[in-house]
Regions:
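A conserved beta-strand element that flanks and buttresses the S-adenosyl-L-methionine
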Residues: 94
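A short glycine-rich, Lys/Arg-flanked "PGG" loop and its adjoining helix->strand segment in the class I
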Residues: 106-119
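Conserved beta-strand signature within the Rossmann-like core of class I S-adenosyl-L-methionine
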Residues: 118-126
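Conserved class I S-adenosyl-L-methionine
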Residues: 1-31
């Protein structure tokens, strides 16, 4: 995650519009209540907090990005493979353009499933070296209800 530490000050300038576009697409398709709890795995600077009008939490391994995210929502430093939350703690779990960075993506998917109660949005970078393997892992771990093609990602809406 050294790359993200190095670009942390310019992260939003580089990725804001792209990430907000994905987040808007996710919000349009995922029905949520103000009482719902949303977990953003690989939250970066916490852009998801700008759109979801409910309880939000973020987790990311990069300390420098979390320094920005914690101004927007509660955060924890950690990896997707070892989420520091209780089982079934979140109504919605999102993981946008992060899965390809996991050391063990399958374990990360199982962790998301463990802490979620049934609504998931996971995007996979189309140019990820392991794209096909990641798609298979998501399909094996979750029931994919809808697939949306974004310019750079495939967004999977799962149960």
């Amino acid at each position: 995650m050294q790359y993200y530490a190095q670009i942390s000050q310019g992260y939003e300038e580089l990725h804001r519009d792209e990430q907000l576009g994905k987040l808007k697409a996710v919000m349009e398709r995922m029905k949520y209540e103000k009482t719902d709890k949303v977990l953003d795995v690989g939250c970066g600077t916490g852009l998801s907090s700008l759109l979801f009008q409910c309880q939000k939490f973020g987790v990311d391994p990069t300390f420098e990005l979390l320094q920005q995210a914690k101004k927007r929502m509660p955060v924890a430093q950690g990896t997707g493979e070892a989420l520091p939350f209780k089982d079934n703690a979140f109504d919605i779990v999102i993981c946008l353009t992060a899965l390809h960075n996991f050391q063990d993506p399958q374990r990360g998917l199982l962790e998301m499933k463990r802490v979620g109660t049934g609504r998931f949005a996971i995007s996979i970078l189309k140019r990820a070296k392991a794209f096909d393997a990641l798609m298979k892992m998501v399909n094996a771990t979750f029931k994919v209800k809808e697939m949306l093609e974004d310019p750079k990602d495939i967004i999977l809406f799962c149960a």
